[in-house]
Amino acid sequence: DVSFSLSGSSSTSYSKFIGALRKALPSNGTVYNITLLLSSASGASRYTLMKLSNYDGKAITVAIDVTNVYIMGYLVNSTSYFFNESDAKLASQYVFAGSTIVTLPYSGNYEKLQTAAGKIREKIPLGFPALDSAITTLFHYDSTAAAAAFLVIIQTTAESSRFKYIEGQIIMRISKNGVPSLATISLENEWSALSKQIQLAQTNNGTFKTPVVIMDAGGQRVEIGNVGSKVVTKNIQLLLN
């Protein structure tokens, strides 16, 4: 289990936390030196916990599915909150034992969360101040702000663990929030496709069977077609199996 506290935090403590989160995910080996996540896991071994504390020291404990870094739910004191989906319902049988379970009115995917938040990710600022607010919102479970809070937490933890570029984007926003770059959104959307193509490239001389189009930092469309790309060699840290 891993933890991150905003109180006394720095770029170093955040990077250490993201590194610890990556290491907390069991691996099926590597593909082109990138960690390949497990294709499945059963029982309690399918989950790892992540404790997040705001500047005030208030903490939530988040349950993560180790096969895909998806957030299932979280615990505050003796109450747990889980997304309204079958995977999260299953998780509730193995984590936060003895807690009172509240089922949230939405599932944990971006589309559903954006609909509930009434905002797309492109419009929701990220950064340490945003993370502080998000933890506070979930700690008190403010239902009107919870969906947007999840969008902040997912990107600041899971997405940062998947992509070094996103980790760097959060670090740039330590003192001041900023909306995510187009490249950030694009990498988030294409993680599954990139994971698949990098694995297929093993038997295809390093070439993708189907190129993946992403936006670069300057907002230009870039076609990624092989494992020599910087996205593969320098950026992606985890592969969905």
Swiss-Prot record:
Pfam families: RIP (PF00161)
InterPro entries linked: Ribosome-inact_prot_sf (IPR036041), Ribosome_inactivat_1/2 (IPR017989), Ribosome_inactivat_prot (IPR001574), Ribosome_inactivat_prot_CS (IPR017988), Ribosome_inactivat_prot_sub1 (IPR016138), Ribosome_inactivat_prot_sub2 (IPR016139)
EC number: 3.2.2.22
Glycan attachment points: N28, N33, N77, N84, N205
Keyword annotations: Glycoprotein, Hydrolase, Plant defense, Protein synthesis inhibitor, Toxin
Class of the enzyme per the UniProt entry, highest EC level: hydrolase
Example of a GO biological process term: defense response
Active-site feature positions: E159
Coiled-coil segments on the chain, per record: none
GO terms, molecular function: rRNA N-glycosylase activity; toxin activity
Catalytic activity: Endohydrolysis of the N-glycosidic bond at one specific adenosine on the 28S rRNA
Family: Belongs to the ribosome-inactivating protein family. Type 1 RIP subfamily.
Name of this protein: Ribosome-inactivating protein luffaculin 1
Species the sequence originates in: Luffa acutangula (Ridged gourd)
